[in-house]
Design a protein with these regions (language model features):
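N-terminal mature ectodomain segment of secretory-pathway/periplasmic proteins
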Residues: 2-73, 140, 145
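Gly/Pro-enriched, hydrophobic low-complexity segments
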Residues: 15, 50, 56, 65-66, ...
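Flexible, processing/modification-adjacent segments and terminal tails
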Residues: 2, 6, 63-132, 138, ...
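Short linear motifs at secondary-structure transitions and domain/linker junctions
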Residues: 11-13, 20-24, 31-43, 93-98, ...
Length: 216
């Protein structure tokens, strides 16, 4: 977490698998890929294709832009001056949430350890992320998490969580690859694409509230 906290820029790819109940009983798995670029303290880009609508989020320190390229919708709102505050705003206004938020805030260790009840060392693994990892497990009042942390670079390679209040004990897993810390980021990386400028504007709001009414 010290490496993450001290990096002015960072990028990674996140591959998320989330279980969802099925009518037959056993859960189904839905997957999403995220391409994440961060420039602290006030720039963020998240591009997300997956088993559902593709989404893109851009934050430049002044505004948040959410773009749905397939539906051709774009939502824009004024935003506060830090990544953490902008992500809080995105959740409060539009229920936009990402499973890797704790990794990109200013103090990842504080975010990950908040409310910690128990933690223990499981052992080593050589099968995750193509590197040797330390495997740890920890729990708070909300979730039980197993984490694979690079033994040499101290970067998270896999996180696996079960939420304590979930009666079905569904599993949520994220593999994290392509880590790049401290590398230059192109000046226009945090600006929406040209297609977003031509998209249909909608309110930056919860999905059902923001979607335009269909023509009869």
């Amino acid at each position: 977490s010290d490496r993450l906290a001290s990096a002015r820029t960072l990028s990674f790819s996140g591959f998320v698998g989330e279980e969802s109940p099925s009518r037959l009983g056993p859960p189904l798995l839905y997957t999403t890929k995220y391409a994440v670029t961060v420039q602290r303290p006030d720039k963020l880009r998240i591009v997300s294709p997956g088993d559902g609508p593709a989404t893109e989020l851009y934050y430049d320190g002044r505004s948040l832009v959410a773009f749905a390229p397939k539906e051709n919708y774009v939502a824009t709102t004024a935003a506060p001056a830090t990544i953490e505050a902008a992500l809080d705003l995105a959740f409060d206004k539009a229920q936009i949430y990402y499973p890797f938020v704790d990794l990109i805030v200013a103090d990842p260790f504080k975010a990950l350890s908040e409310g910690l009840r128990v933690a223990f060392y499981v052992g080593e693994s050589n099968t995750v992320g193509g590197v040797r990892t330390h495997v740890i497990a920890y729990a708070n009042d909300h979730a039980f998490v197993q984490a694979w942390i690079g033994a040499d670079d101290r970067l998270p390679r896999r996180l696996r969580a079960i939420y304590r209040k979930d009666p079905l004990q569904l599993r949520h897993q994220m593999d994290i690859t392509d880590w790049k810390l401290g590398e230059p980021v192109a000046a226009g990386a945090f600006a929406p694409p040209e297609a977003a400028k031509k998209a249909l504007p909608i309110p930056f709001d919860r999905p059902q509230a923001a979607a335009p009414a269909k023509k009869p």
